[in-house]
């Protein structure tokens, strides 16, 4: 396994694979890796000859007062984990390598599907994601890119700009990886105190309860209200509890498939989760 820190170095490492027409897979991360990230790498290994994992804490997707400065940088530990699952190349650039030293005048913005959910509470976040992922796609030039479905809205944004900008790759969404108690794996779970970690699985428990209620024919808006109450009663500060169609348009009682979304803070830690529900009205 190689580690490259410059765009030129990565290109040199990938040139032999390109010349041999090998299939290149790409997993973008911000490091502080967990089993969810490693699952993405394993999925990439199934489809691709060469797998590149980027580790870059991207400043443009953090808003004021968010955790950019405190976000864990664990490159040595991440490298060991990636070697164990067969990663071929780590790309770990500096901020200067990715953005240069001159003023940045170009932005990439995806409208409509970023207007609510995490987009309303984290203004500018998805613009930062779209910019850095586009830059990484241009640098790596993969055949496939792999993203977790925990960040469902982010995945939708990436699919949208890949389609709109004719970026020649396929985006693969990988199902959420959960702890045994149902909590969706996230690098930010490490911010939770032991007591908060015991409470955090209530999000998934509530989503599963909501799914069951929908299958029983309960009113969608009442189900969402009950889920919000459950979270509030357990100490969460709820950002949103929403239902959407898979394309992120507003969902109704009569849609056959919906996605339930939750974002809530537990102490100072913001947690997100979602559950896709195949729903047949009673």
Swiss-Prot record:
Binding site residues for (R)-pantoate: 61, 154
Cited InterPro entries: Cyt_trans-like, Pantoate_ligase, Pantoate_ligase_C, Rossmann-like_a/b/a_fold
UniProt keyword Cytoplasm, yes or no: yes
One GO term (biological process): pantothenate biosynthetic process
EC annotation from Swiss-Prot or TrEMBL: 6.3.2.1
Record keywords: ATP-binding, Cytoplasm, Ligase, Nucleotide-binding, Pantothenate biosynthesis
Top EC class, one word: ligase
Chain sites annotated for binding ATP: 30-37, 148-151, 177, 185-188
Molecular function terms from GO: ATP binding; pantoate-beta-alanine ligase activity
Keyword Ligase: yes
Pathway(s): Cofactor biosynthesis; (R)-pantothenate biosynthesis; (R)-pantothenate from (R)-pantoate and beta-alanine: step 1/1
Gene3D superfamilies: HUPs, Pantoate-beta-alanine ligase, C-terminal domain
Any one GO cellular component localisation term in the record: cytosol
Catalytic reaction list: (R)-pantoate + beta-alanine + ATP = (R)-pantothenate + AMP + diphosphate + H(+)
Xref: NCBIfam families: cyt_tran_rel, panC
Protein name: Pantothenate synthetase
Organism: Acinetobacter baumannii (strain ATCC 17978 / DSM 105126 / CIP 53.77 / LMG 1025 / NCDC KC755 / 5377)
Encoding gene, per UniProt annotation: panC
